């Protein structure tokens, strides 16, 4: 999965695997992989003006694991 730098708020980079529907986010505090993420959620997160607001509202509740 290719990680794209974003350097916004508490986020450093993110990447998405459309086959596995996994979103990987590198925070300043570590890397988390979120599962079952639809592509449209990733696309909207990528262009969101406030990454923190979008993350808290649309991504945080998905299943996740720390690391890869």
Feature locations, PLM:
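Acidic/histidine-enriched, beta-strand-rich ligand/metal-binding domains
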Residues: 1-68
């Amino acid at each position: 999965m290719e990680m794209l730098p974003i350097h916004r708020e508490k986020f450093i980079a993110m990447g998405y695997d459309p086959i596995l529907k996994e979103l990987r986010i590198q925070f300043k505090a570590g890397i988390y992989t979120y599962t079952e993420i639809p592509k449209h959620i990733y696309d909207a997160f990528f262009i969101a003006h406030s990454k923190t607001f979008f993350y808290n509202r649309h991504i945080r509740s998905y299943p996740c694991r720390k690391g890869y």
